[in-house]
Every structure is written in C-alpha cells, then in structure tokens.
Amino acid sequence: MSVFTTLQQHIQRNGALIVSCQPVPGSPMDSPEIVAAMATAAAQAGAAALRIEGVANLQAVRPHVSLPIIGIIKRDLDESPVRITPFLRDIDDLVQAGADIIAFDGTQRPRPERREALLARIQHHGRLAMADCSSLEDGLYCQRLGCDFIGTTLSGYTHGETPCEPDFALVHALSNAGCRVIAEGRYNTPAQAAQALSQGAWAVTVGSAITRIEHICQWYCQALQAEAHHEYAGH
C-alpha cells in the first residue's frame, strides 16, 4: 500500500490531524527518547501522521510507529533565510532515517539549492514531497513543479510581525486553486483546526499546542496574569 493511500485511510478513520513533535530547542523535552514518546502517544491518540525534525529524532521515532512521517531538517544558515531542509544531503539523510514524506522550504527566497533540485531528489528516492510555503504564489509554483502537498507552514514567518491567528485565507485560496493543502502554523485550538478543514485543507498540522509544554504554560500564565491585573485594577 502506498504512503499516500495509508495516510488517506488514517485521515478517513481518525481525522486529518498531523502532529508535529518538535520540542523547544534546548528544553528538558529536547531529546530523541522524549520525541519518540510524544510521537507514540500521538499515534495512539489517533494522529494520521507525524512531523519530525532531525535525523536523530526520526531514527528514534521510526521503530515505534507505523504512521507516515514527514521528515525535516532545520538549519540556521548565514547566507540564506531558508531553514527547512535546505540541502540535497538533508533529503538523503531523512530518507535513510525513515521519512515517508519530506518537507522543504518552498518560498521564493534566496537559497543554497533550487526548489526544483530538492523536489527531484525527493522523487528520486520515491518519497512524497511537501512544500512549506508562505504565500499563494509560493504554493502555486510548487504545485506546478509537482509537489504532492502544499503547506501553509511559513505564512506569517517570512517578513514583518507574525500574526496570532492562522492564515485561513491562504488555505482557502490554495485549495480553490487545486492544491492538496496541509494547513500549518498557529493552529492552537481544535476549533481553528476544524475551521481549516472547512476552508478546504486536506489535513492540519498542530505542533506547539500539543507538544510544546513551555508554550502552552506561557499561554495560561499570560491569560491568568492579564486577568489578575484586570481584577487588581478594578479594585
């Protein structure tokens, strides 16, 4: 059975949730063993697929789950703002580690390897390709190249201030243009994830709201502090 068919069956059976297991770098949760535990728990809870960063994490997760895994490698480059799977060798390493789908930065920014070359390498290995995009133009370009999935992953992260809400409009526009859209980026509530489906998303990736304890704790702390200040001001 193909990876795409397997993923589609998981979506039909349990829903269209992809869980991104990426701890805050340097946090107490940032170890392959903990990432593997997160991924296993997400799989047991009904996730349709997983998104895993880094070869060590992917190698730790792969023996424990049969779900399709979207693999990425993040790098901080001096010569380019592109961070997600920027090199051909990253694709080779992710394939070797067990990724079924490989995601790469699909934006039109300066980069060490052309998008066409990255996609060709993914296809050479017989894997599915996901383009992490920031705009309609990015998504349509990568769709024309032949990417299997178009993610809204980088919307709001390439310039200016990052908004609080997900980019539902981009999901809708890409879906209307015929893209198989994976909504990603700031989907912090179940209601937002469901809204993405109503806008045409094929699946929804959720990360921080499920697997980043620090972020979730900060959300609660900020809300409680704001209410406490409001109550104090009222007196």
From Swiss-Prot:
Q: What Gene3D superfamilies does UniProt report for this protein, alphabetically? A: Aldolase class I
Q: What is its EC number?
A: 5.1.3.9
Q: Which SUPFAM superfamilies match?
A: Ribulose-phoshate binding barrel
Entries under Pfam families matching the protein: NanE
Which GO BP terms, alphabetically? carbohydrate metabolic process; N-acetylmannosamine catabolic process; N-acetylneuraminate catabolic process
At the top level, the lineage of the source is: Bacteria
> What CDD domains does the record tag this protein with?
NanE
What is a single cellular component term in the Gene Ontology annotation? Answer: cytosol
Q: Which family does it belong to?
A: Belongs to the NanE family.
Function noted in UniProt: Converts N-acetylmannosamine-6-phosphate (ManNAc-6-P) to N-acetylglucosamine-6-phosphate (GlcNAc-6-P).
- Protein name per Swiss-Prot or TrEMBL: Putative N-acetylmannosamine-6-phosphate 2-epimerase
